[in-house]
Amino acid sequence: MDYESIQNLHAGDHFNFKGLEWVVLDPDKEGGVLAITADLWAENVPFSQEYFEGCNDWRKSTIREKVRGLMHKIGVDNLLPHIVDLVADNGDKLYGTMEEMVFLLTCDEYRKYRDVIPKYRRWIWTCTPWTTTSTGDASNVRTVSSGGSLNTVSYTHLTL
C-alpha cells in the first residue's frame, strides 16, 4: 500500500514506508496511524548497557537511543508525538510519562493491539519496567516472547 492511501488503512494492514514494512496498530491515532515494524529492525540490543539504579527506565536506556535512530530514517516530519506511559508492571508511576516520536510499546499497548502485532522470531522489549527504584530491584523489564506472552528479563539480555 502506498503512502498516499494511508487514510484508508485498517488495523492489521501492512504497508511499506521508508524501506520498512509496517503493520497498522491503530489507523486513527492522534491524527495519523500507530504502526509497528513487521519484522525485527535490530537484534542483540540490551535495554541498558550496564547496571545502575533505574537501568530499566526507558528515559535513561541504551535501547532508547537505538530506537531514536529510526527518526532519521523515517524523517521527523513524518512522525507525530505520542505519550508513553512508563508505569511499572506493579502500578508504580515513579518514571512518569514522556512524549516520544519513536518508541517501544508498553505492556498496556501490547495488550490493546495484541491481535494485530506480528509474532516475531525472537522475543522483544517493551518499555514497561517490572518495578521502579522506589520498590526495589529496578533492573528488570517486561518483554514479549516469540509466542506472544509477556515475560520479565534483566536489562542486559540481548535481543531486538
For the regions a language model picked out, list residue spans one by one.
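Collagenous Gly-X-Y triple-helix signature in extracellular proteins
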Residues: 1-158
